[in-house]
Amino acid sequence: MSIILIGFMGAGKSTVAKLLAEEFTDLDKLIEEEIEMPIATFFELFGEADFRKIENEVFELAVQKDIIIATGGGIIENPKNLNVLDRASRVVFLTADFDTLWKRISMDWQNVRPLAQDKEAAQLLFEKRMKDYSLVADLTIDVTDKSPEQIAEQIREKWEIE
């Protein structure tokens, strides 16, 4: 059974997934392979609606495997993805307050985040998404004062993963 990591940008989903399994699936990377371009470029060319459609198709295939999946922060924007998450039995919501996440996002030069160009807009998006993350989560972890290793250990303990 898969473990699916959800949460806002900057919560550490990909970092924690790497600690849980040597072979994990970063949904954003799978999507980039499918669309053959960076997500930020796709957003510019085709918009968010087309991106969410492809994201759902790739996600539906990924959850059929017994793997660790790090999702993009907007996975919950598509009602179809909410249904998939609701059916999944091991969904982990990594959360923190907005200021903590914004600081992480601002310091991350490796990832271009199309929806994180403006702090006020990002905060509105954060507030909008929080409820949906909580609704589908089987485990919620506040990552504010925890290292990625501590978070991974908490997940391992919950589902007795080695």
Swiss-Prot record:
Its EC number is 2.7.1.71. Substrate binds at residues 28, 52, 73, 129. Its cofactor is Mg(2+). Pathway: Metabolic intermediate biosynthesis; chorismate biosynthesis; chorismate from D-erythrose 4-phosphate and phosphoenolpyruvate: step 5/7. It is found in: Cytoplasm. PROSITE patterns: SHIKIMATE_KINASE. Keywords: Amino-acid biosynthesis, Aromatic amino acid biosynthesis, ATP-binding, Cytoplasm, Kinase, Magnesium, Metal-binding, Nucleotide-binding, Transferase. InterPro entries: P-loop_NTPase, Shikimate/glucono_kinase, Shikimate_kinase/TSH1, Shikimate_kinase_CS. It comes from the Bacteria. The keyword Amino-acid biosynthesis applies. It catalyses: shikimate + ATP = 3-phosphoshikimate + ADP + H(+). Pfam families: SKI. Binds 1 Mg(2+) ion per subunit. One of its GO terms (biological process) is amino acid biosynthetic process. One of its GO terms (molecular function) is shikimate kinase activity. Its main location: cytoplasm. ATP binds at residues 10-15, 113. It is an enzyme of class 2 (transferase). HAMAP family: Shikimate_kinase (MF_00109). Monomer. Belongs to the shikimate kinase family. Catalyzes the specific phosphorylation of the 3-hydroxyl group of shikimic acid using ATP as a cosubstrate. This is Shikimate kinase.
